[in-house]
């Protein structure tokens, strides 16, 4: 396919995805590739390209696991293209995607209390508050939380993007206080009004919370989409 860029094919790949949450993850990868090398093709994305992309992500302040997610998305597109006989090239045979181990335990009640009451720096307050909101809303997934429409009353009803399962949550006073503090224009919270992509916000959230004393943010309030 002469003249067809990797981004051109990625756009078609994204269109075939049914779930909005999945689409958004690949849209994020598309943005990174567009910033790094918008004219990349299946032919030019080789071992050396992957290494340069990985280093560029690192220099841009992205974490190991966040970078790994983007690389796995690129790999998924290659696998799909190979299955559909679009290309026979596969640069991942000799490229190992790095992964940073995370603590497998959950935060204890004492950890959460310490995090809630911790005297954080000004820039960390929002990240701490949003994490606590995830906890107050029974571990709601980030993609679901940030896409909720403006709140009406004191109940949240939503379908989880990953499973399509219906949930109903009562908003307790502690959660309501945070929601009102970061009220959005088009959504319940202002995260997507400001960041446009929830993955960018989550990256900053994890980085900020890891600097709050010895309290570590674990799990992003549920499994990452």
Where do the protein language model's features map onto the residues?
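Conserved tyrosine-mediated DNA breakage-rejoining catalytic core shared by Y-recombinases
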Residues: 146-181
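Short, basic (Lys/Arg/His-rich) helix/loop patches that form interaction surfaces
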Residues: 122, 206-225
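Major-groove DNA-contacting interfaces characterized by cationic-aromatic clusters
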Residues: 177-208
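Basic/aromatic-enriched alpha-helical hairpins
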Residues: 2-60
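Short, contiguous acidic/charged loop-to-helix segments that flank catalytic cores in large enzymes
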Residues: 120-121, 157-167, 192-201, 220-225
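Short, leucine-enriched amphipathic alpha-helices that occur as contiguous helical runs
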Residues: 26, 112, 126-128, 202, ...
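N-terminal DNA-binding recognition helix of tyrosine site-specific recombinases/integrases
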Residues: 32, 40-45, 59-92, 138-140, ...
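Basic, Lys/Arg- and aromatic-enriched nucleic-acid-binding interface segment
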Residues: 68, 87, 93-142, 146
């Amino acid at each position: 396919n002469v003249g067809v860029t990797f981004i051109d094919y990625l756009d078609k790949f994204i269109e075939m995805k049914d779930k909005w949450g999945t689409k958004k993850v690949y849209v994020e990868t598309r943005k990174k590739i567009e910033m790094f090398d918008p004219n990349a093709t299946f032919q030019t994305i080789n071992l050396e390209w992957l290494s340069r992309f990985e280093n560029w992500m690192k220099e841009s302040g992205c974490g190991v696991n966040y970078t790994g997610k983007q690389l796995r998305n690129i790999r998924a597109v290659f696998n799909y293209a190979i299955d559909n006989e679009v290309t026979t090239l596969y640069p991942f045979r000799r490229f190992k995607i790095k992964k940073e181990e995370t603590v497998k335990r959950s935060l204890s009640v004492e950890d959460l209390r310490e995090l809630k009451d911790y005297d954080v720096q000004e820039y960390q307050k929002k990240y701490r508050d949003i994490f606590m909101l995830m906890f107050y809303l029974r571990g709601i997934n980030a993609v679901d939380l940030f896409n909720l429409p403006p709140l009406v009353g004191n109940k949240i009803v939503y379908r989880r993007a990953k499973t399509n399962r219906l949930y109903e949550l009562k908003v307790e006073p502690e959660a309501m206080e945070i929601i009102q503090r970061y009220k959005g224009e088009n959504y319940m919270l202002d995260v997507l009004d400001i960041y446009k992509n929830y993955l960018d916000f989550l990256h900053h959230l994890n980085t900020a919370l890891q600097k709050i004393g010895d309290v570590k943010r674990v799990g992003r309030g549920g499994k990452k989409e």
